[in-house]
Regions:
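Extended, highly charged segments
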Residues: 1-168
């Protein structure tokens, strides 16, 4: 179980007393964009949309064809246009155990003292994971799980370089 302020991907059947406000929907849109094909496409901006579950169907109406593995979306879509393709990764300690987390850059910056902001780029994610491993000691498997693809580091605060030591 993670503390409530730790960014994490959660799948829930219903929200317990929480409502989805515009800020949470924007965070979900940023994450959906970062984990989509837009990341490997290398673009700096992208567009995503959201729909209600009842609007998604695997069955076709008369005269329509739906290919294997495809879905049909009917009705009004909520569009999130011209969003930055970026993701934040950060280092936190949960019950004394260091963990790497990913989320929206703003949320990770607010939660994790050691963090980095990433954008699509040319550095292979395995190479970046090895660099972070040498600095933090976290396993490369954990790091690869939070990196969406080849990326460039936009901002960095202690993830690629050791944090500054205070002199006594």
């Amino acid at each position: 179980h993670l503390p409530p302020d730790v960014p994490a991907y959660r799948l829930v059947d219903k929200l317990e007393g929480e409502s989805l406000n515009e800020a949470k929907l924007n965070e979900a849109a940023v994450l959906a964009l970062a984990w989509s094909r837009a990341w490997n496409g290398g673009g700096a901006h992208g567009t995503v949309y959201s729909v209600k579950p009842a609007q998604v169907s695997k069955s076709a109406q008369t005269g329509e064809f739906v290919g294997k593995g495809a879905f049909v979306v009917r009705g009004q879509r909520t569009w999130y246009k011209d969003m930055d393709v970026r993701i934040g990764i950060g280092l936190i300690a949960v019950n004394g155990v260091p963990m790497v987390v990913s989320g929206t850059p703003e949320h990770v910056q607010a939660t994790c003292p050691r963090h980095a902001v990433l954008a699509p780029g040319r550095t292979k994610k395995e190479q970046l994971a090895n660099t972070i491993y040498r600095t933090t000691g976290l396993s490369t498997d954990e790091l690869l799980a939070v990196l969406p693809g080849a990326c460039d580091v936009i901002e960095e605060y202690g993830m690629l370089t050791p944090p500054a030591q205070e002199e006594e």
